[in-house]
């Protein structure tokens, strides 16, 4: 059936269109983000990046994985998907998030985190083995000692993760 998703190795078929994971240079990944990301520019720093291409070789999406932006999470065992950007290709987000999770665990990281806006449903994250961890308030990076122009959404974000996360102590 041409309209159903099928995984064959590292390839996905959807409606007759195949997407597959491929390596990509940092310059290519950052260029794609500059052209296609809805609300962010390129991240500062990265540990690795990967991409999905279609059967014609057209770049359809990229993921950038780096150290956690939140200092309290930067323990040497945690990674963050700091950017994920596609052109809307079916299942590209799931493939990119799944690859980020697998690579991180294979490299010895114990957990990963990423953040989405409330209007982004999270189906791709759930499909690729990530769990909803809760909400976190957005905030500005601008402080009196170092004023900055905020160019990203400052509202509530959904936190997603995989791996070993300590449970918060209950009040029971």
Residue ranges and their predicted role:
Residues 1-17:
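Short, Lys/Arg-enriched N-terminal segments with co-localized hydrophobic residues
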Residues 18, 78, 157:
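A residue-level signal for beta-strand positions that form part of recognition/binding surfaces
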Residues 23, 47, 53-54, 62, ...:
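Acyl-donor binding region in acyl/amide transferases
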Residues 39-42, 131-135, 167:
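Short secondary-structure junctions
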Residues 13-44:
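Short amphipathic alpha-helix that is part of the acyltransferase structural core
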Residues 158-172:
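Charged phosphate-binding loop/patch that engages nucleotide di/tri-phosphates or the phosphate backbone
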């Amino acid at each position: 059936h041409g309209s159903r998703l099928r995984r064959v190795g590292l390839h996905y078929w959807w409606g007759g269109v195949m997407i597959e994971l491929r390596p990509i240079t940092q310059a290519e990944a950052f260029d794609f983000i500059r052209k296609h990301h809805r609300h962010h520019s390129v991240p500062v720093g990265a540990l690795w990046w990967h991409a999905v291409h279609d059967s014609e070789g057209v770049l359809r999406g990229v993921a950038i994985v780096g150290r956690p932006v939140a200092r309290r999470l930067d323990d040497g065992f945690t990674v963050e998907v700091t950017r994920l950007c596609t052109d809307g290709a079916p299942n590209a987000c799931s493939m990119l998030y799944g690859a980020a999770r697998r690579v991180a665990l294979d490299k010895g990281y114990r957990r990963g985190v990423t953040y989405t806006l409330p209007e982004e449903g999270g189906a791709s994250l759930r499909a690729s083995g990530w769990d909803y961890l809760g909400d976190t308030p957005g905030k500005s990076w601008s402080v009196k000692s170092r004023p900055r122009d905020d160019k990203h959404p400052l509202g509530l974000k959904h936190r997603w993760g995989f791996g070993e996360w300590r449970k918060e102590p209950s009040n029971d």
